Regions:
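Conserved alpha-helix/loop element of class I SAM-dependent methyltransferases that forms part
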Residues: 22-40
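Conserved class I S-adenosyl-L-methionine
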Residues: 40-46
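Class I SAM-dependent methyltransferase SAM/SAH-binding core
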Residues: 49-51, 55-95
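A conserved beta-strand element that flanks and buttresses the S-adenosyl-L-methionine
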Residues: 106
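A short, conserved alpha-helix within the catalytic core of class I
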Residues: 114-123
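Conserved beta-strand signature within the Rossmann-like core of class I S-adenosyl-L-methionine
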Residues: 130-137
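C-terminal alpha-helical "lid/dimerization" subdomain adjacent to the S-adenosyl-L-methionine
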Residues: 139-193
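Conserved Class I S-adenosyl-L-methionine
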Residues: 180-218
Length: 218
C-alpha cells in the first residue's frame, strides 16, 4: 500500500497490533451528520458488533443490522440493550435483506466484500423515495495522489492510535474482530461505477484508506 521501507512498516504493524483503534468508528459521527434528525427505519449493512446500529437508534424509530458473520452478530446482540429499537440478522444483504423501504441505509467498510454495482442497485431499491444512502468504503491505492494521502495517513494513524488508547496497550475491540479482506477497486473505478448506478452521488477520498459516498434518492 505504501513505499515506506519494510522495516518501518513492520514496526508500525507491531505498534498497531498492541494499540488498535477502529478506523470505521472514526466516521460514525460524520455518518450521523449526513442523516435527518429523525428517521423512520434504517438499515445498517455489514453491521458487525452493532456500534453504528446503536448510534442510528438515536435517530430512527427502528434499526435493522445485517451481517453474514454469525459470531459478530451474536456479539452485537449481547452488546445491545434489549429495549433499544435495534434488531440484527445473519444474512446476505443482497439476497435476504428485510424488505424496505428504509429512510437511511448505511454501509461501512463492507461494500468491497460485495459486487459493487449490484450492491448499489440493491441499496437504491430498498430506499424510500426521500431516503439517503451513506457508504464508507475502502479502496485500493493506485495513482500518486493515493500514495501522497497514504503518506499523511500513516503518521496520523499512529497519532490516533496513541490518543485513542491513551498511550497504553489494549486488546482489539469487538468491532475489529470480524473477518476482512483487502479492497480490489481503485477510487477512480469506484467513482465511475457509483455515478453510473447512482446519478448525482457524492464521493470523496478520506484519510485512513477510506472514501465516502452519499446519495439522496429523489
Amino acid at each position: 500500500m505504501t513505499t515506506w521501507p519494510p522495516r518501518i512498516m513492520r514496526a508500525l504493524e507491531q505498534f498497531h497490533a498492541t494499540h488498535p483503534w477502529d478506523h470505521n468508528a472514526h466516521y460514525h459521527r460524520w455518518i450521523l451528520r449526513q442523516l435527518p434528525r429523525r428517521l423512520g427505519r434504517a438499515l445498517d449493512v455489514g453491521s458487525g458488533s452493532g456500534d453504528l446500529a446503536r448510534l442510528l437508534a438515536s435517530r430512527a424509530g427502528a434499526v435493522h443490522g445485517i451481517d453474514v458473520d454469525p459470531t459478530i452478530v451474536d456479539r452485537a446482540r449481547e452488546l445491545t440493550d434489549p429495549a433499544a429499537p435495534v434488531s440484527f440478522t445473519v444474512a446476505d444483504a443482497l439476497k435476504e435483506a428485510p424488505p424496505g423501504p428504509y429512510d437511511a441505509i448505511t454501509c461501512v467498510a463492507t461494500i468491497h466484500h460485495m459486487p459493487f454495482s449490484d450492491a448499489l442497485t440493491c441499496f437504491r431499491h430498498h430506499l424510500s423515495p426521500d431516503g439517503v444512502l451513506v457508504v464508507v468504503g475502502v479502496y485500493r491505492p493506485q495513482p500518486l495522489s493515493d500514495y501522497l494521502i497514504d503518506a499523511v495517513a500513516i503518521p496520523a494513524n499512529v497519532a490516533m492510535a496513541w490518543i485513542k488508547n491513551k498511550g497504553r496497550k489494549a486488546p482489539r475491540p469487538a468491532s475489529m474482530t470480524a473477518p476482512t479482506r483487502p479492497a480490489t477497486m481503485t477510487f477512480a473505478d469506484t467513482v465511475l461505477d457509483a455515478r453510473r448506478a447512482l446519478p448525482g452521488a457524492r464521493l470523496r477520498r478520506r484519510l485512513f484508506w477510506r472514501y465516502t459516498l452519499v446519495w439522496h434518492r429523489s
